[in-house]
């Protein structure tokens, strides 16, 4: 039997043994002790013979539920759920709820745990039913509302998310304005998918009303403007987003440059890029600026700019573009080396993880507004300059 099972069930076995012994002591009866011991040792025998489910049944049957033992039940069920043994957690919590000796508070606690078991199993309907029962009875209201929000997020029921999180704000005294703004953005995306830009605009304006700094809403409004050929309006919104949240500049820079170019304002785009390169290094603006320099002044000038730039602000994309420009220059007898370097850099770039959740550490190659791992909103950011430095060191080691 795996050692983990022994470790998991030892607390229950110990509690059962203690309970049996204390019961015998209270009755001061050797006969009672003899009657308890065979059942207890039967449970241990199941445990040692790789039959953990039977062991659980025996120990739970022995262990009457009272103020001294309910925490043992709850702790064991919680432990099973955290380990992914959800069916066993469900059995333990259902066993608790079926006991008539439970107080109202104890039953509510067990119901909350069972609801979380169902959530872990993906049985959201069952979990929601239990949580709504607790909510109606005004029991564990704050954790109940938190779990309901998680369920509605999984089901993408954004209207229910909004109503529930507003109730959570009232009950907990907290504010979740950023989260609400994302719910409105999700509703706007649904409206856009249905071809209703006007409804989408309404949702996005509501997102900005509840959280003024919602760069996602600003970006989506700009995209609607672009779709409706209102490019100047879109540019104003995108420049505002870049100013408010420069960390998201890589997500919007291409649209900014495209609008400037479509308007024929090359002076404006160059001024914007030069300003961003100075203020916010390694956000991708250096690549666009290098391309404009190349178009206006040639490969040599673009190469000089990028060489000086990455000497101060190392970045993998900048290094790759520099090598590509070097490959276009007149041959210096090292073409083979340059092409090999470029191939290695592209391989490393394709393997690189660009984004990471600042809360739970989840890694991704693209931006997620909600972390797929911890479900937090706006916590996934691009990797830092320190990690870019580490990538440069990796390149040197490989080559």
Predicted feature residues:
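Structural register within alpha-helical repeat arrays
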Residues: 42, 76, 114, 148, ...
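Alpha-helical segment of the N-proximal tetratricopeptide repeat
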Residues: 32-68, 75, 81-85, 91, ...
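TPR alpha-solenoid repeat register
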Residues: 72, 106, 110, 144, ...
């Amino acid at each position: 039997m795996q050692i983990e099972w022994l470790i998991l069930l030892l607390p229950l076995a110990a509690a059962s043994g203690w309970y049996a012994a204390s019961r015998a002591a209270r009755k001061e009866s050797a006969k009672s002790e003899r009657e308890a011991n065979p059942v207890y040792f039967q449970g241990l025998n199941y445990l040692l013979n790789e039959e953990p489910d039977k062991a659980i049944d025996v120990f739970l049957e022995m262990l009457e539920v009272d103020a001294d033992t309910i925490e043992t039940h709850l702790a064991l069920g919680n432990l099973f759920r955290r380990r992914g043994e959800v069916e066993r957690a469900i059995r333990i919590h259902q066993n608790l709820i079926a006991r008539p000796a439970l107080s109202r508070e104890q039953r509510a606690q067990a119901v909350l745990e069972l609801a979380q078991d169902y959530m872990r199993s993906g049985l959201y309907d069952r979990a929601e039913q239990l949580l709504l029962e607790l909510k109606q009875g005004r029991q564990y209201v704050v954790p109940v509302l938190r779990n309901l929000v998680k369920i509605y997020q999984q089901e993408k029921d954004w209207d229910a998310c909004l109503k529930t999180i507003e109730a959570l704000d009232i009950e907990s005294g907290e504010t979740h304005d950023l989260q609400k703004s994302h719910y409105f953005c999700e509703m706007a995306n649904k409206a856009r998918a249905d071809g209703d830009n006007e409804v989408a605009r309404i949702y996005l304006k509501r997102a900005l009303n509840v959280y003024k700094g919602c760069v996602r809403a600003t970006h989506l409004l700009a995209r609607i403007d672009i779709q409706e050929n209102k490019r100047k309006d879109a540019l104003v919104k995108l420049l505002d987003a870049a100013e408010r949240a420069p960390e998201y500049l890589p997500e919007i820079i291409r649209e900014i440059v495209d609008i400037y170019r479509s308007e024929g304002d090359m002076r404006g785009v160059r001024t914007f890029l030069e300003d961003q390169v100075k203020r916010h290094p390694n956000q991708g603006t250096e690549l666009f600026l290098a391309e404009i320099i190349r178009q206006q002044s040639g490969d040599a000038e673009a190469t000089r700019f990028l060489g000086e730039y990455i000497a101060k602000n190392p970045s993998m994309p900048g290094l790759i573009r520099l090598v590509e420009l070097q490959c276009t220059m007149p041959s210096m007898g090292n073409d083979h080396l340059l092409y090999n370097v470029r191939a290695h850099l592209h391989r490393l770039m394709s393997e690189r993880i660009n984004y990471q959740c600042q809360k739970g550490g989840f890694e991704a190659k693209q931006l997620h507004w909600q972390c797929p791992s911890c479900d937090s909103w706006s916590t996934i950011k691009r990797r830092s300059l320190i990690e870019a430095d580490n990538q440069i060191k990796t390149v040197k080691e490989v080559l």
